[in-house]
Regions:
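Conserved N-terminal/central alpha/beta ligand/cofactor-binding core
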Residues: 1-35, 81, 104-110
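Second-shell loop/turn segments in exported
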Residues: 2-5, 59, 183-190, 320-324, ...
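Solvent-exposed, acidic/flexible segments
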Residues: 4-8, 12, 66, 186, ...
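Sec-exported extracytoplasmic/periplasmic mature domains
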Residues: 20, 68, 77-78, 205, ...
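Glycine-rich, acidic and aromatic/proline-enriched surface loops and short helix-turn segments
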Residues: 21, 35, 39, 299-315, ...
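Catalytic cores of secreted or luminal carbohydrate-active enzymes
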Residues: 24, 347, 351-372, 378-396
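Flavin (FAD/FMN)-binding glycine-rich loop and adjacent Rossmann-like elements that form
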Residues: 29-30, 40-45, 49-62, 66-362
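Extracytoplasmic Gram-positive cell-surface binding/anchoring modules and repeats
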Residues: 372-482, 495-497
Length: 497
């Protein structure tokens, strides 16, 4: 965890610096949404209110819901899922046989700071405190490994001797069924989560002896010094143009829909569900996955226009939401949502009418990933070519489930056989014939095969040595222009009517 942690105040400063560079961007704080403005089936904006009862009405060509729980989906009239999906609907082996309305536990995060040896920052005992609720949070068996208390705290260690308190095992997770409640009723219920985190902080200080760790006084200006909002792991999930499931992630090349070809953000987190605080939740297990991408169609509602969905409210199954919910993923998905909106507005069309490849190209222009390649970084001169060609499926990748940071490999310096290459071309376009040969592909043979596929090359001296996948990707991109062929939201090449 600590590899991706930063102090909230530092993150806020960086985001504000980025936003300040956008001259046409106006940021307004302190308002919450009260309604969605619609004309027929199209969203036209939203109304807001603040704690002073001041109102705000915003009209927009495109409205994006980037809330944790899909707060405006119901207001917008967009169909959505909530809770665990059934095996029948998702075809996922680990999904429950019967759907239910159970969502993951949420957490109200605290930031503790080390005030130095000999200090006592113990807070007042919170109401309803019971040490037994937290017995087993450390020095207990977890997956047959002993977790001592120092390690429990260092799980969320940040710079400047600060600690994020977000601990699932006998920690400050809490189950609250609040998604469908009104704002007022939800806020009342969420007080329980704040109190439970304060109880855990008191336990850390009073029972475990870390009296020098107190609530950070330089992060949040809330009355209790806790975070501004809870960490929701799950909420409403829109029914979208595409529906990402565990199967699409675990085995991307053998699904009815080639959603990997339509990727707009990437992630490497495993399937991770928090349900320890709800005894009624079925155990789904943690099925392994490689790193993955999120398809563009998951951001677009099935039927409602003028509306884009981001964050955890995208069209993904309950099971795979355990991976796509993570903050690095939703940040990238948010970038893609803004890019999608920009492309739609520029072309004066609805999001569902955009060119998948145009959105992806815009993201690539920003050095964003559309394919989750671990071994080809944005600084690589061949990054864009390799991203594009793997997104066509002509050259394949190899996924790997690895600890808490999964991987997908391209192996840019490796060679492939003539058969592997022609199989990829055949899957891209059935007019291309498969050549059954285990001989390593040379530059000369690659050019011959690509010429038959319609590519054009200048007369050059071609090497008879095996060609690397890196150079092959560049060759395909420069000659065949495969990425320029339009695809639909399922990854199929569009046919001209």
């Amino acid at each position: 965890m600590s590899n991706t942690l930063f102090e909230p105040s530092v993150g806020n400063k960086i985001f504000n610096q980025i936003a300040a560079k956008e001259k046409k961007l106006e940021i307004i704080h302190g308002y919450y949404v009260t309604s969605i403005l619609k004309e027929g089936n199209s969203v036209k904006g939203a109304t807001f209110k603040n704690d002073k009862n001041e109102t705000l009405e915003v009209h927009a060509k495109i409205t994006i819901d980037a809330t944790d729980i899909g707060e405006t989906l119901k207001m917008a009239g967009a169909a959505y899922r909530l809770g665990m999906d059934s095996q029948k609907e998702t075809k996922e082996a680990n999904a429950p046989l019967k759907a239910n309305n159970i969502v993951q536990d949420l957490t109200w995060v605290a930031i503790l700071k080390d005030y130095g040896k000999g200090t006592d920052k113990t807070i007042a005992k919170p109401s309803n405190y019971s040490a037994s609720n937290f017995t087993g949070s450390c020095m207990e068996t977890v997956d047959h490994k002993e977790i001592d208390c120092d390690k429990m705290l260092s799980y969320g260690k940040m710079p400047n001797n600060k600690y994020m308190i977000n601990w699932p095992k006998k920690g400050n997770d809490v189950y609250l069924d609040v998604v469908e409640l009104s704002r007022e009723d939800r806020n009342k219920e969420l007080l329980k989560a704040r109190n439970y985190t304060l109880q855990f902080v008191y336990y850390i200080q009073n029972e475990l002896g870390y009296k020098n760790l107190g609530l950070a006084d330089d992060e949040f200006d809330t009355s209790d010094l806790l975070a501004y909002a809870p960490y929701y792991r799950e909420g409403r999930r829109v029914k979208g143009v595409s529906f990402l499931t565990y199967n699409h992630v675990a085995d991307p090349y053998n699904q009815k829909e080639a959603l990997y070809k339509t990727g707009i953000s990437v992630g490497d987190y495993p399937v991770d569900h928090h349900h320890k605080q709800n005894p009624n939740a079925p155990d789904l297990g943690f099925p392994a996955v490689p790193s993955y991408n999120v398809p563009l169609g998951s951001l677009i509602p099935e039927k409602v226009d003028g509306f884009i969905v981001s964050d955890k409210a995208i069209s993904a199954s309950n099971l795979i939401n355990g991976a796509t919910r993570l903050q690095p993923v939703v940040l990238l998905t948010g970038q893609a949502a803004g890019t999608l909106a920009g492309v739609a507005i520029k072309n004066n069309i609805e999001p569902r009418k955009v060119s998948v490849r145009e959105v992806q190209q815009s993201l690539l222009n920003q050095k964003a990933y559309i394919m989750p390649l671990y071994d080809v970084k944005p600084t690589d001169p061949a990054f864009e070519a390799i991203q594009k060609i793997t997104a066509t499926g002509i050259l394949k990748t190899k996924g790997e489930s690895y600890k808490w940071a999964n991987r997908t490999w391209f192996y840019p310096e490796q060679n492939i056989t003539v058969q592997e290459f022609t199989e990829g071309l055949n899957q891209f376009d059935k007019k291309n014939k498969i050549v059954k040969s285990s001989v390593l592909l040379t530059e000369q043979e690659a050019v011959n095969i690509l010429t038959k596929a319609g590519a054009k090359f200048p007369k050059e001296n071609l090497s008879a040595k095996p060609i690397s996948k890196r150079n092959l990707a560049i060759l395909i991109e420069e000659s065949l222009h495969a990425f320029e062929k339009e695809i639909d939201f399922s990854g199929n090449i569009k046919t001209k009517k």
